[in-house]
Amino acid sequence: MEEKRTAFIERKTTETSIEVDINLDGEGKYDIDTGIGFFDHMLELMSKHGLIDLKVKVIGDLKVDSHHTVEDTGIVIGECINKALGNKKSINRYGTSFVPMDESLCQVSMDISGRAFLVFDGEFTCEKLGDFQTEMVEEFFRALAFNAGITLHARVIYGKNNHHMIEGLFKAFGRALSEAVSKNTRIKGVMSTKGSI
């Protein structure tokens, strides 16, 4: 019987209290409450389009700003992905997705390599969308990548509408992650000549 690729992590600091529950072999079901409406929406899209079940509950110091809440959520989601992957046997390892959203086009490519790295290429023309600071998009993906052990490249190829560009990135991340964590029966062990990831 296949081992379930799920994880639950709870993290508490003086700034945030976070619970994340993830199922990499899910159906895209979600229950998200970070206290930041726009961020909730982006995580819901990531879950739905990545076919990953995701529950996130956050109590953060939003009276300061969104920084700690968004970054710490990225940390815990990254830790959950890494934990749920287990020994990483038979996974594709690599995933790439291009996602159009009206006038914008975004690309996310990843390698579940155990080597944490982020290349982010995207500029936004407004400071906030709702209560979400747009500069936190990059910080979220950095926190997630470094705690999941993923080499991640995320870029806005072109676009004008800030909402569309950010939405494209989160959808593309979900789809690329789904591809990378999917199992291939032809892969014996892990996808590495070193024998480990």
From Swiss-Prot:
Keywords: Amino-acid biosynthesis, Cytoplasm, Histidine biosynthesis, Lyase
Annotated GO biological process: L-histidine biosynthetic process
Pathway(s) the chain acts in: Amino-acid biosynthesis; L-histidine biosynthesis; L-histidine from 5-phospho-alpha-D-ribose 1-diphosphate: step 6/9
TM region(s), chain numbering: none
Catalytic reaction annotation: D-erythro-1-(imidazol-4-yl)glycerol 3-phosphate = 3-(imidazol-4-yl)-2-oxopropyl phosphate + H2O
Domain of life of the source: Bacteria
Location(s), subcellular: Cytoplasm
GO cellular component: cytoplasm
PROSITE patterns in the cross-refs: IGP_DEHYDRATASE_1 (PS00954), IGP_DEHYDRATASE_2 (PS00955)
EC number assigned by the record: 4.2.1.19
Record keyword NADP present: no
One example GO MF annotation: imidazoleglycerol-phosphate dehydratase activity
UniProt similarity note: Belongs to the imidazoleglycerol-phosphate dehydratase family.
Protein name: Imidazoleglycerol-phosphate dehydratase
Gene name as annotated: hisB
